[in-house]
Amino acid sequence: MAPRGCIVAVFAIFCISRLLCSHGAPVAPMTPYLMLCQPHKRCGDKFYDPLQHCCYDDAVVPLARTQTCGNCTFRVCFEQCCPWTFMVKLINQNCDSARTSDDRLCRSVS
């Protein structure tokens, strides 16, 4: 292939990939298979967009979902409730780990 043909082929591949991966209006897939270039994760048997939802207790929930932990409110997608100490920790921290500046101590509700 001539150098000019290579340039045209590379340009065509670039244009097609940009078209397939463009972030236009969202389109719901007609099949259970994922569309190319869409960031999706799985929660049980359902797929979800991690930019809008998370998987909490085997259910797809919005990122803004909150629950109570004692007298505190925590964001289930980013924090967790340690019920035996009524402490809210970041989701990736172990409830048994030492207290950090990110932790919130909550009182139990009687």
Curated annotation (Swiss-Prot):
GO CC aspect terms: extracellular space
Molecular function in Gene Ontology: signaling receptor binding
Assigned keywords, A-Z: Disulfide bond, Glycoprotein, Secreted, Signal
Entry-linked InterPro entries: IGFL
Tissues with expression: Detected in ovary and spinal cord.
Signal peptide: 1-24
Glycosylation sites: N71
Primary localization: secreted
Protein's UniProt keywords contain Zinc-finger: no
Keyword Transmembrane helix part of the UniProt annotation: no
Compartments it resides in: Secreted
Function: Probable ligand of the IGFLR1 cell membrane receptor.
PANTHER family membership: INSULIN GROWTH FACTOR-LIKE FAMILY MEMBER 1 (PTHR34827:SF2), INSULIN GROWTH FACTOR-LIKE FAMILY MEMBER 3-RELATED (PTHR34827)
Quaternary data: Homodimer; disulfide-linked.
Family: Belongs to the IGFL family.
Protein name: Insulin growth factor-like family member 1
Taxonomy of the source species: Eukaryota, Metazoa, Chordata, Craniata, Vertebrata
